[in-house]
Amino acid sequence: MSLSPASGTAGRTNWPAEILPVLEHTLTCEYASLTRTGAPITWPVAPYVAEDGRTVDVSTGLTYPSKAERARRDPRVALLYSDPTGSPVSGPPTVLVQGLATVRDADLQANTDLYLRRTLAKYPRSFARQPWFLVRRQVWYLARIWIEVTPLRVLWWPDGRLDVPPLRWEATPEVTAPPSDPVPAGAGAPKWLEPPADWRPRADHAAGLGDPVLTVVGEDGWPLPLRSSGATRVDDGFLVRIGPPGVLARGRACLTFHTHGADMSGQENVVLVGEATPLSDGVHVRVERALADFSLSGSRAGQVRKMVRTARALAPRLEREAARRGQPVPVPRRPR
């Protein structure tokens, strides 16, 4: 297939033109990174195309930096754009980007300014009902670490048809990513949220959140997140229906269920990890545990109460993480 140079926001690249609207307008993507032991972990995040059009970027909070620290240790990451909820793009392809991550946390104030600017542009209702003095109090959430992903390989399924082989694009051999900012000094804060003791109630609940994303590690060592066409709950996990190239998925696995409103007024996540084995009728995922997650669902009042509780838990970590990077705590500033 012959591809013409991309245009628009990502015009300085030769990414396939048909994927650009998806990269620019999809509200959430599934971001996959690798643990110290090489197991994949996948979470829904907000994606952005960089202003210079050379990377696709996601972020994580300074107070919960695990997504960034995994990428700093092993820059092989993947972004799957498979949920069109709230997107203005009609009949979008499902897009998988595999690339090298560059972690940016050497300028926390600039990171926070950029996050606010991008968030208000892409999600204008994010702070629409809040006076700015309340927004400023959310610095525990708004202080950001950026993860810039340089695409090396893109797979996409036109019209979201997951039952057919994907189209494929690869960067030229000289394309690489700049190094990440230095590892912060000292030890990071301990985990702030305990995972469920029993994964089964979370798995039962997840069955109502739509088709999950199954992530395994491909033969090339890259995380491979793929949207399934359905999952059936079984005693020890799930039987997942998956199209090519996931039919032979095996090894360490992550199942990510998530949903969000068209206006991003709420979101809910369930992430389960275990072991995948290919079968004749799908991929069997034996679940070992559920990960601790932060979801915002239910009434607006309930969401506010949860944010207040979370702020109390995470605020003490803010100064510690900023100090590890030799910087003051950033100040949320209204974009001009």
Predicted features and spans:
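Short coil-to-beta transition motif at edge beta-strands of beta-rich domains
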Residues: H25, D74-V77, G208-L209, V247-H258
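Surface-exposed interaction/gating patches
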Residues: P182-P223, R227-S228
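Short gly/pro-enriched beta-turn/loop segments at secondary-structure junctions
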Residues: E24-T26, W140-R144, T150-P151, A207-D211, ...
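Short amphipathic alpha-helical segments and helix-helix/interface helices
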Residues: I19-L20, A68, A203
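Charged, gly/pro-rich active-site loop segments
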Residues: S2-T13, S90-P201, R241-R336
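A generic structural signal for nonpolar/aromatic side chains embedded in well-ordered alpha-helices
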Residues: V22-L23, A71, T119, A206
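Mobile-element integrase/transposase regions
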Residues: R12-E24
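Short beta-strand segments
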Residues: T26-T63, E69, A78-D83, V89-P93, ...
